[in-house]
Design a protein with these regions (language model features):
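Catalytic phosphate/metal-binding cores of nucleic-acid and nucleotide-processing enzymes, i.e., regions
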Residues: 1-105
Length: 105
């Protein structure tokens, strides 16, 4: 199976939403553990993030790629590919969507 995960407020917490560097984000270990288990079972893991798309007016999501990749590495996240540039939105409606709370509980 292929899984696509968001990053912020899904596998990490950002208490300071005004921190556009995302350096204040910290991991949610039990969620990362579940993702790593899926990876180890042979599933494909993608991350799709809106970092750099919202408050920065959709200017340069790629500017945050290095920071994001470093965080995923430091947090021990196993994945196949990181996609930057997810459009910022209040809601995402998808026929295959599931809330993070439902998935991780």
């Amino acid at each position: 199976m292929v899984y696509v995960f968001d990053i912020d407020d899904t596998i990490c917490i950002r208490d300071n939403k005004n921190d556009l560097t995302y350096l204040s984000a910290y991991p949610i270990p039990e969620r990362i553990e579940k993702i790593n288990q899926l990876y180890d079972e042979g599933h494909t893991i993608y991350f799709l993030t809106a970092r750099g798309m919202g408050r920065s007016n959709n200017k340069n999501p790629e500017n945050l790629r290095g920071t994001t990749e470093q965080q995923l590495f430091e947090w021990g996240v196993k994945y196949h590919e990181l996609f930057m540039g997810k459009p910022a939105a209040d809601y995402y409606i998808d026929d295959k969507g599931i809330s993070d709370k439902d998935f991780f509980n």
